[in-house]
């Protein structure tokens, strides 16, 4: 959600940002609705003042035993009550229209975010690691199916497309990855582990900017609740409607959960393998900060996500997204892209975003400093630390040998005692 006062004061900034996102002319529409709302509020306040004054005079007339005047004033108050109801409806209608328009408009990028239309305009910040020399690398699906440990056909029979069944050593490797990530983020990076609900209500989905714009990308139950597309939703919602002590910030939460996405806009993209699934596991990172802390916390979060790839010795690059490629709620976003030998390119494995106070305004999450009056909105940040399925894909492809065996990364061997490879002798 946006601060209407900021839009009034710097309309050009908002118009430029929204036009770049394909929503030109919205500022004029917002200011028109804002003017109508303020006019309705002024008229309502005037009518309330007139009613209060008339009610006061009724008492005075009765005290003076002027029944005729009292009767006239009472009739006038009744007329004002009807006018107040009508004016109140005008105010509600204008307010709802303004809120609905603001709710559908994306966040404003930070000043340092580069201009650009799409992923081709993103800026590479750094690279880590060198891709291994692998002769004729196989893709992860071919490797998994050859071992008999990755079954897309069985998944399709029971669930349809974009699902997978992992078995045996591969299921164990996937579990080890998730546990390793969670241990790293909690034991070394100071995140508090949370086991959150996988179903959330409209308020939680709205507060984390998934509703109303992205309803078609979510799965909804028959009772109206939503399966989480990411643990960002319940983790950030821990502060929904709350006032937290500034002295306790930053708050850092992490969770390993299944995530559910309809992939409504992904027709024809990544149809083979595990890159784009309706259900997948992910370790999520969420931070709640003061406005002054959020920029540094963002850089820290990116480092926490990068640490997973470094420990696994997977080559990757870190990209600063341009304005046109950022998500709806993001003020600034870094993507981590891991090297996939079969595709001979880097693919997204994590996205770390600073939303500023965009989500906090939607969910009314505030902070208060001890000894001071008033509150202010917190800043919220979220990132993948990492997507477990895509990390499994990267491990399979980067650690394959010519015989189709997969070496287990050193960082994962404590989670798989006695094993050094998958697909052959231990």
Curated annotation (Swiss-Prot):
HAMAP family: Ser_tRNA_synth_type1. Keywords: Aminoacyl-tRNA synthetase, ATP-binding, Cytoplasm, Ligase, Nucleotide-binding, Protein biosynthesis. CDD domains: SerRS_core. Pfam families: Seryl_tRNA_N, tRNA-synt_2b. ATP binds at residues 261-263, 348-351. It comes from the Bacteria. This is Serine--tRNA ligase. It catalyses: tRNA(Ser) + L-serine + ATP = L-seryl-tRNA(Ser) + AMP + diphosphate + H(+); tRNA(Sec) + L-serine + ATP = L-seryl-tRNA(Sec) + AMP + diphosphate + H(+). Homodimer. The tRNA molecule binds across the dimer. Consists of two distinct domains, a catalytic core and a N-terminal extension that is involved in tRNA binding. GO terms for biological process: selenocysteine biosynthetic process; seryl-tRNA aminoacylation. It is an enzyme of class 6 (ligase). It is found in: Cytoplasm. Catalyzes the attachment of serine to tRNA(Ser). Is also able to aminoacylate tRNA(Sec) with serine, to form the misacylated tRNA L-seryl-tRNA(Sec), which will be further converted into selenocysteinyl-tRNA(Sec). Gene3D superfamilies: Bira Bifunctional Protein, Domain 2, Serine-tRNA synthetase, tRNA binding domain. Its main location: cytoplasm. One of its GO terms (molecular function) is ATP binding. NCBIfam families: serS. Pathway: Aminoacyl-tRNA biosynthesis; selenocysteinyl-tRNA(Sec) biosynthesis; L-seryl-tRNA(Sec) from L-serine and tRNA(Sec): step 1/1. Its EC number is 6.1.1.11.
């Amino acid at each position: 959600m946006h601060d209407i006062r900021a839009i009034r004061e710097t309309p050009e900034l908002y118009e430029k940002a929204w036009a770049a996102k394909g929503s030109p002319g919205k500022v004029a529409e917002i200011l028109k609705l804002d003017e109508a709302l303020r006019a309705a509020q002024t008229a309502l306040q005037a009518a309330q003042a007139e009613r209060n004054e008339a009610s006061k005079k009724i008492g005075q007339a009765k005290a003076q035993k002027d029944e005729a005047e009292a009767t006239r004033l009472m009739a006038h108050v009744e007329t004002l009550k009807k006018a107040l109801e009508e004016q109140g409806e005008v105010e509600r209608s204008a307010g709802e229209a303004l809120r609905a328009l603001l709710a559908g408009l994306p966040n404003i990028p930070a000043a340092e975010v580069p201009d650009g239309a799409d992923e081709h305009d993103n800026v590479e910040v750094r690279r880590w690691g060198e891709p291994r020399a692998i002769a004729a690398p196989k893709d992860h699906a071919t490797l998994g199916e050859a071992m008999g440990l990755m079954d897309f056909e069985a998944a399709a029979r029971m669930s349809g497309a974009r699902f997978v069944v992992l078995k045996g050593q591969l299921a164990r490797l996937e579990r080890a990855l998730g546990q390793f990530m969670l241990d790293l983020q909690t034991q070394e990076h100071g995140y508090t582990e949370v086991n959150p609900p996988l179903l959330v209500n409209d308020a939680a989905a709205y507060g984390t900017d998934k509703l109303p714009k992205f309803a078609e990308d979510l799965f909804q139950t028959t009772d109206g609740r939503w399966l989480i597309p990411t643990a960002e939703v319940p983790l950030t919602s821990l502060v929904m409607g709350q006032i937290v002590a500034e002295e306790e910030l930053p708050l850092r939460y992490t969770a390993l959960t299944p995530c559910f996405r309809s992939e409504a806009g992904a027709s024809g993209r990544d149809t083979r393998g595990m890159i784009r699934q309706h259900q997948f596991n992910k370790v999520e990172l969420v931070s709640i900060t003061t406005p002054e802390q959020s920029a540094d916390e963002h850089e820290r979060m990116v480092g926490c996500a990068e640490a997973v790839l470094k420990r696994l010795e997977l080559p990757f690059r870190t990209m600063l997204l341009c304005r046109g490629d950022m998500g709806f709620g993001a003020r600034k976003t870094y993507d981590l892209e891991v090297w996939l030998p079969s595709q001979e390119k880097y693919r997204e494995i994590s996205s770390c975003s600073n939303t500023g106070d965009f989500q906090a305004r939607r969910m009314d999450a505030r902070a208060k400093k001890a000894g001071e009056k008033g509150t202010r909105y917190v800043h919220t940040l979220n990132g993948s630390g990492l997507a477990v399925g895509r990390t499994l894909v990267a491990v399979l492809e980067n650690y394959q040998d010519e015989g189709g065996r997969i070496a287990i990364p050193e960082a994962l061997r404590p989670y798989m005692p006695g094993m050094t490879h998958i697909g052959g002798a231990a």
